[in-house]
Amino acid sequence: MIFSKIESYEDIVKKLDKKEDKIAIISCNTCARTCGNGGINKLNELGFRLIREGYNVTDEAVVLYACSEPILRESKLNIDDANTIIVLSCSAGWSCFTRNYPDKKVLKVTEDIGLVITDTDREIFKVVMPYKGHESELGNEYRTNSGEPLTSNKIKLRCVA
């Protein structure tokens, strides 16, 4: 599973034009939800805040896997009114949307950190293969669905670089 972190709200709105952008927010319900930057909760949080601040949010949807072109086709998203798509997913999901919606501005609002393993019974995930620039994340654990860092290790696994 890919661990990504979402940009700050302030950084996201810097990429938007309040007058011109008609925004669709699409959220991954797998990796991004598990990491706390996708799923219905993060979609609603971002969507409501943008609307409150006067942005034109035309559509919102949750897809099972944002990185899967067959799943994307099966989703039959109706985002014709949008000219801008905010994708709450890892870079693989963002890339899938850029390929399938070349006529729209597709915003990447997350940064990939690395690969993780999950313990769904204890609702935690652990970074086991950080990407370049994120080596300090090796072995760090987080609460699933929120991305909240944990202070003690729960998953017993030796991580080596």
Task: Label each region the model flagged.
Residues 1-63, 74-85, 96-161:
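Iron-sulfur (Fe-S) cluster-binding modules
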